[in-house]
């Protein structure tokens, strides 16, 4: 892809705005993590809201950039679109992972960088899958609904299968939570690379 065509592609998908949103999200997450830990009677476990909401906002920013201005042109293109879709999804995801890992350093055994990385990967996968079903502009809704439910309902221990259905609220090192997040990322990425985002009337 030529540089001019690459710039046009990035602008048409709104990627500059999405990248700016990722930087802002990471900065806010870093500030919130330090503030929560500094409060009296709080410790590093108080960072749970940060390792959930930070990845959720990052996934939403990435998801809204997955729209296509013209799905008809995409379908009739000479070259397959799946490599570009794959790069489009994974490049900002890698950036989000790096930024949010830096935002919550230390205490890997609880709600530190591993939990932030896992939640970013898993929620990006959920968002990518949602983009293929409801469109990129609304792709933030399903992961937001999921996060809201599990944040309120998931127990503090892993009983009752919470490590599976409440994976986003689990401490960083738990293998079961990582397995679910990896499955979400793999399924969402494959679905988006194959189908692309659903075109919804009014998207440009």
Regions found by a protein language model. Give the residues of each.
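Secretory targeting signals
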Residues: 34, 40-68, 89-144
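Juxtamembrane helix-loop boundaries in multi-pass membrane proteins
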Residues: 79-90
